Amino acid sequence: MNTLKNKGRWIKPVLKYFGILFVLLCAPAFANECVSYKITPKITISAPTWTKEVVQPLEPMNMWHGNVVATMVDNYDIVADITSVEDGFCVGIKQVDAEIGYSNFLVQVDIRHVPNTCSYDAVLAHEDQHIREYLSVIDDFQVELHNALYSAADSVMPIFVYNSSDIDLAIEEINNKIQSHPEMVIIKQKIKADEEIRNKRIDKNDNSETLKKCFL
């Protein structure tokens, strides 16, 4: 009796082991089957409609310079190519609609500058230069952004899922792979670096002469 019980105890773990092994061995096979369903992804990139808000913090700032807080967004809408195959679905990329750029500029001006006065307008004019540079950086990198996004999207192979309920998770995984792709990481770093260079150039070339004239 003890021997039979022991055998019974071993049967379930062994069956469970073979079940797991079957899934592990078959999943790559199904994934390989999905490769044949890969298509060339279409890429579109648009810039968000941006807004500007001017505020005057209660605490004193540098009277000669304002400050711009730029909010950058990069959203990726994946249009999936879903193919029904034996035992599941292949989820690939048909199109990526990206929105990349600045959505908001928060301009801070020292509270000692009264709105609609010479000094207030002079500070705003300077900060508007920074805003124009932020926008021009995105414009100048459009080709590189498109190429980087295409390379990232084209590198992602279709993902196999067993159930239709897992398709959304597959699309989320595709999105993460695109955003973490080396070319996407590098292009964002290049944009940030160029922003810093251009903003420093504006401040370096500004001797505040326009603002100083307001106090003569």
Task: Give the location of each predicted region.
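Bacterial N-terminal signal peptides
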Residues: 17-26
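Active-site scaffold of zinc-dependent metalloenzymes
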Residues: 87-119
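Short N-terminal segments immediately surrounding and downstream of signal-peptide cleavage
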Residues: 32-47
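Bacterial N-terminal signal peptides that target proteins for export
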Residues: 4-18
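Metalloprotease/metallohydrolase-associated module, dominated by Zn2+-dependent proteases
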Residues: 35, 51-98, 153-216
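Sec/Tat signal peptide C-region and signal peptidase I cleavage site
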Residues: 27-31
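Catalytic Zn2+-binding segment of zinc metalloproteases
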Residues: 128-143
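Short alpha-helix carrying the canonical HExxH Zn2+-binding catalytic motif
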Residues: 117-129
